[in-house]
């Protein structure tokens, strides 16, 4: 479907007052997640206190009512890195993490890099946690979140994660999952991130729902040297079920998302806006059902070649196949000034049978609502 460009689509988010309790419930694969449940809310006031609450063994509801700035809390490092994309002011440089420059960019010029240590590794989040922002006040600056090593039953809602060494590749990921289960990420904003805004690592991440979140790729530095972040969203787990619904993915030049290994992704009612490169990158083992989404000013909705499988819900007749596996027909996607998105692989749709499936609305609903409703402060 084609539609005209909406005026003001990139307008600022509309702040609203939110209560310090979970709003709504997870749809899709993470349906039933409870986080900290009925635990009494705690309000950390320092970065140390926040780290302690997130990582302890008690069920907790942790309310963020201020900015927790980790910048400088772990010192800085000056080392030799590299410049794979040149040394122009808008180009990201790379930290030589795990000898990445040495092994993968041997011809890149060497450069001196100085980065903030806090951004490199996120805060560990243990099981049975709810992390809630109060209004638009809950911000974690300079450090991400890390849900790993069997952690499960976690809700992250209405917070922002910002400013993780944006000048440097390997400068840090906003949210990392690896060997996790039952995680709901909702109404989260990420901005100015050195590496991935969201990454699901190589171990199984099982049941995850990412909803109503704003991935903001506007940056002074990027791998494409044009102000469009390249490192967006990376789904590469060994047995992952991901519902990705109602999200606003804005101003990226690639990897938004990259899907591979053994990942079943249901991308529904999202809004991709303004990309100089590609949105989806689908490697071997990536299985993507995309329906009811909006692609506006996206040069390449999916990068070629597609090594996994993709069902793009191309038309109402073809979309009736979804009824067998989802219990309803799929919704067509909408396009404005965007490239081709038309593949219709169906063999993998059987993997949706018997699972919790998110509902879908016509793409026009996402077109009108997602830019102003996604992200922090919009519960």
Swiss-Prot record:
Function field: Pectinolytic enzymes consist of four classes of enzymes: pectin lyase, polygalacturonase, pectin methylesterase and rhamnogalacturonase. Among pectinolytic enzymes, pectin lyase is the most important in depolymerization of pectin, since it cleaves internal glycosidic bonds of highly methylated pectins.
Annotated GO biological process: cell wall organization; pectin catabolic process
SUPFAM superfamilies, alphabetized: Pectin lyase-like
Protein localization: Secreted
Signal peptide, first to last residue: 1-19
Reaction(s) this enzyme catalyzes, per UniProt: Eliminative cleavage of (1->4)-alpha-D-galacturonan methyl ester to give oligosaccharides with 4-deoxy-6-O-methyl-alpha-D-galact-4-enuronosyl groups at their non-reducing ends
PANTHER family: PECTATE LYASE 18-RELATED (PTHR31683), PECTIN LYASE A-RELATED (PTHR31683:SF16)
Gene that encodes the chain: pelA
Name listed for the protein in its UniProt record: Probable pectin lyase A
The entry's keywords: Carbohydrate metabolism, Cell wall biogenesis/degradation, Disulfide bond, Lyase, Polysaccharide degradation, Secreted, Signal
Active site: 255
The enzyme's E.C. designation: 4.2.2.10
Keyword Secreted: yes
Main location: secreted
Disulfide pattern: 82-101, 91-225, 322-330
Single GO term (MF): pectin lyase activity
Organism name: Aspergillus oryzae (strain ATCC 42149 / RIB 40) (Yellow koji mold)
Gene Ontology annotations for the cellular component aspect, listed alphabetically: extracellular region
Family: Belongs to the polysaccharide lyase 1 family.
């Amino acid at each position: 479907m084609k539609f005209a460009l909406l005026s003001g689509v990139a307008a600022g988010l509309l702040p609203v007052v939110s209560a310090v309790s979970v709003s709504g419930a997870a749809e899709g694969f993470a349906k039933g997640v409870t986080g900290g449940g009925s635990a009494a809310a705690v309000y950390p006031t320092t970065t140390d206190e926040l780290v302690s609450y997130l990582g302890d063994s008690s069920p907790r509801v942790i309310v963020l009512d201020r900015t927790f700035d980790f910048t400088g809390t772990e010192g800085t490092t000056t080392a030799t890195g590299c410049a794979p994309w040149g040394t122009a002011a808008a180009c990201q440089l790379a930290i030589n993490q795990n000898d990445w420059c040495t092994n993968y960019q041997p011809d890149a010029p060497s450069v001196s890099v100085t980065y903030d240590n806090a951004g490199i590794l996120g805060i560990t989040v243990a099981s049975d946690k709810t992390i809630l922002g109060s209004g638009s006040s809950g911000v974690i600056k300079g450090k991400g979140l890390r849900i790993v090593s069997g952690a499960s039953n976690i809700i992250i809602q209405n917070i922002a994660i910002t400013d993780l060494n944006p000048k440097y590749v390997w400068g840090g990921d906003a949210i990392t999952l690896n060997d996790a289960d039952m995680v709901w990420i909702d109404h989260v904003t990420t901005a100015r991130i050195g590496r991935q805004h969201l990454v699901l690592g190589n171990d199984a991440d099982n049941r995850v729902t990412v909803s109503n979140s704003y991935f903001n790729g506007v940056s002074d530095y990027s791998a494409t040297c044009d102000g469009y972040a390249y490192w967006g969203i990376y789904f590469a787990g060994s047995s992952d079920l991901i519902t990705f619904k109602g999200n606003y993915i804005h101003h990226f030049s690639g990897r938004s998302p990259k899907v591979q290994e053994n990942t079943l992704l249901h991308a529904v009612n999202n809004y991709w806006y303004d990309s100089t490169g590609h949105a989806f990158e689908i490697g071997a083992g990536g299985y993507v059902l995309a329906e009811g989404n909006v692609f506006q000013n996206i040069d390449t909705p999916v990068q070629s070649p597609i090594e996994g499988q993709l069902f793009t819900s191309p038309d109402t007749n073809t979309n009736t196949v979804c009824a067998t596996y989802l219990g309803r027909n799929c919704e067509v996607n909408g396009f404005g000034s965007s490239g081709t998105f038309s593949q219709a692989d169906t063999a993998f749709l059987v993997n949706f049978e018997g699972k919790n499936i998110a509902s879908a609305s016509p793409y026009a609903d996402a077109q009108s609502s997602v830019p102003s409703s996604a992200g922090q402060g919009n519960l």
